Amino acid sequence: MEKPEQKLLLYKLSDRLFAAIQKNLQLERRQALLVKLGIDTVLNVIPKLIITIILALLLHELVPVLVFMGSFLVLRGFAYGRHLESDLLCTILTAVTFVGVPYLIQFTDGIPELFRFILCLLLTVPIGMFSPAVTRKNPIKSQSLKRALKHKAIITSLVFSFLQFLVSNNLGTIIVVSLLLVFTLIVPLKGGKSDEAENV
């Protein structure tokens, strides 16, 4: 788990960057919330990305890992979803998942093209229903922002559904798995609602 002083340093850096941007751009409240969320996300993700990319290079799996990571992170940026409370555990699981899944898929024949497309469309339905999955870590009060994120999540899922036709079988399978991973992180765990505070 991260030391308190390390977390404090990240919070201070985030606040300073946000204050500088806010001072120069005079953002509206909704825009300011998105910028702050973006800064926090980037500062939390960078260490995980570095570790993941190093492992991918060691296993000679950089392109598949980047495809998996990119498709997941783009969609998750709109769908939101649960987070682990421990940064250390999150870093370990991130590296294992982003590197392990593409590495294992290379030893399979992948999923047939038409079946991949059907799976993508089937996954788009619950992703559209439950996005954005608001949590304690990422609360969203604005209904207009929720609607905008929901629409973007649906459009992104549909784009990936067609994009998987343009790549190799293994890369197409990786895109499908990225949608599946997003789905597992936004599907409700308690009470039938995806935006409950209990769904960390």
Curated annotation (Swiss-Prot):
The alphabetized UniProt keywords are: Cell membrane, Hydrolase, Membrane, Protease, Quorum sensing, Transmembrane, Transmembrane helix
Which positions, given as ranges, span the membrane? 49-69, 88-108, 114-134, 148-168, 171-191
**Location in or out of the cell:** Cell membrane
Question: What is the top EC class of this enzyme, as a single word?
Answer: hydrolase
The record's EC number reads: 3.4.-.-
Q: Name one GO biological process term.
A: quorum sensing
| Xref: SMART domains | AgrB
Q: How does it sit in the membrane?
A: Multi-pass membrane protein
Does the entry feature the keyword Zinc-finger, yes or no? Answer: no
Q: What is this protein called?
A: Putative AgrB-like protein
| Disulphide bonds in the chain | none
Q: Which GO terms describe its cellular component?
A: plasma membrane
Q: Where is the signal peptide?
A: none
| Function, in words | May be involved in the proteolytic processing of a quorum sensing system signal molecule precursor.
Q: What Gene Ontology terms describe what this protein does at the molecular function level?
A: peptidase activity
Q: Supply the source organism for this entry.
A: Lactiplantibacillus plantarum (strain ATCC BAA-793 / NCIMB 8826 / WCFS1) (Lactobacillus plantarum)
| Upper lineage | Bacteria, Bacillati, Bacillota, Bacilli, Lactobacillales
First-listed, main subcellular location of the protein, grouped into a coarse class? membrane
